[in-house]
From Swiss-Prot:
<protein>
    <recommendedName>
        <fullName>Cytochrome b</fullName>
    </recommendedName>
</protein>
<keyword id="KW-0408">Iron</keyword>
<feature type="binding site" description="axial binding residue">
    <location>
        <position position="164"/>
    </location>
    <ligand>
        <name>heme b b566</name>
    </ligand>
</feature>
<comment type="similarity">
    <text>Belongs to the cytochrome b family.</text>
</comment>
<dbReference type="InterPro" id="IPR005798">
    <property type="entry name" value="Cyt_b/b6_C"/>
</dbReference>
<dbReference type="GO" id="GO:0005743">
    <property type="term" value="C:mitochondrial inner membrane"/>
</dbReference>
<keyword id="KW-0999">Mitochondrion inner membrane</keyword>
<keyword id="KW-0813">Transport</keyword>
<dbReference type="InterPro" id="IPR005797">
    <property type="entry name" value="Cyt_b/b6_N"/>
</dbReference>
<dbReference type="InterPro" id="IPR048260">
    <property type="entry name" value="Cytochrome_b_C_euk/bac"/>
</dbReference>
<keyword id="KW-1133">Transmembrane helix</keyword>
<feature type="transmembrane region" description="Helical">
    <location>
        <begin position="194"/>
        <end position="214"/>
    </location>
</feature>
<feature type="transmembrane region" description="Helical">
    <location>
        <begin position="288"/>
        <end position="308"/>
    </location>
</feature>
<keyword id="KW-0812">Transmembrane</keyword>
<comment type="function">
    <text>Component of the ubiquinol-cytochrome c reductase complex (complex III or cytochrome b-c1 complex) that is part of the mitochondrial respiratory chain. The b-c1 complex mediates electron transfer from ubiquinol to cytochrome c. Contributes to the generation of a proton gradient across the mitochondrial membrane that is then used for ATP synthesis.</text>
</comment>
<dbReference type="Pfam" id="PF00032">
    <property type="entry name" value="Cytochrom_B_C"/>
</dbReference>
<keyword id="KW-0479">Metal-binding</keyword>
Length: 308
């Protein structure tokens, strides 16, 4: 899945760059500029659909990648693992600021709700939120800085990815048995390159099918309405890939407690290498750990379902 994530990143940067050429980061024009891209730009609708659904595929790939890393004990390559968690956090930040850009209802209210969480931080919270907003509510300054961040962060991700790969190159990759595989090494090309191309093809077919046949399947219908600060949508919720965290946030009645739980649900990945006590690296021959692992997966799926 690592190679698929690389392809996702490249695709997102290319489609994003093409979209940015037609986008206007202004509260009065943002929604109209996206509509203009879809209607009047050659293949603008396709580029937008690929970009929007590409984000979903990016998250599908990264969650599978992390799940596999946990299952096979890959987190024992501590530097690789920690840079990977930082990559996940950066990706989540990028997806969040990107979701705000079309300036639909859910964009606006999602931005309002999530940035407002920073006000739960004691003492500096309120100042921090107003500083992030550039005013006393989510408005034009917020949109322009979010566009700047959304343009910048993917290149930051690309940079950290190189660090991630460098650390991986130090140790070599892991395998399902969790034992050294020096004696089984084979040339990257043509073997691994062909294996990766199969993955690319499957990912690409799935993405194109999604973008062409049901591009709005994962989107929120509220986002077809331009942002209106005076009318709150009946249910504010993020895109599906944040629902597990959002469900955790909303299940805790205390604001600060919810924010801490939300942060912990992702940051717990940093602790995993410290919690490994088994003499075996991978879960291949550890039924109890397997049960716990699949319970965790089921838990995430249930949280995602409940969050919506």
């Amino acid at each position: 899945f690592g190679s698929l994530l690389g392809i996702c990143l490249v695709t997102q940067i290319i489609t994003g760059l093409l979209l940015a050429t037609h986008y206007t980061a202004d509260t009065n024009l943002a929604f109209a500029s996206v509509a203009h891209t879809c209607r009047n730009v050659q293949f603008g609708w396709l580029i937008r659909n690929l970009h929007a659904n590409g984000a979903s595929f990016f998250f599908i790939c990264i969650y599978l990648h992390i799940g596999r890393g946990i299952y096979y004990g890959s987190y024992l390559n501590k530097e690789t693992w920690n840079t990977g968690v930082i990559l996940l956090l950066t990706l989540m930040a990028t997806a969040f600021v990107g979701y705000v850009l079309p300036w639909g209802q859910m964009s606006f209210w999602g931005a309002t709700v999530i940035t407002n969480l920073f006000s739960a931080i004691p003492y500096i919270g309120q100042t921090l939120v107003e500083w992030a907003w550039g005013g006393f509510s989510v408005d034009n300054p917020t949109l322009t800085r979010f566009f700047a961040l959304h343009f910048l962060l993917p290149f930051v991700i690309a940079g950290i990815t190189l660090v991630h790969l460098t650390f991986l190159h130090e140790t070599g990759s892991n395998n399902p048995l969790g034992i050294p595989s020096d004696c089984d090494k084979i040339p990257f090309h043509p073997y691994y390159s062909m294996k990766d191309i199969l993955g690319f093809a499957l990912l690409f077919i799935a993405l194109v099918a999604m973008a062409l046949f049901s591009p709005n399947l994962l989107g929120d219908p509220e986002n077809f309405t331009p942002a209106n600060p005076l009318s709150t949508p009946p249910h504010i919720k993020p895109e599906w890939y944040f629902l597990f965290a959002y469900a955790i946030l909303r299940s805790i009645p205390n604001k600060l407690g919810g924010v801490l739980a939300l942060a912990a649900s992702v940051l717990v990945l940093f602790l995993i290498p410290l919690l490994h006590t088994s003499k075996q690296r991978s879960m291949t021959f550890r039924p109890l750990s397997q049960i716990l692992f699949w319970t965790l997966v089921a838990n995430l799926l249930v949280l995602t379902w409940v969050g919506s």
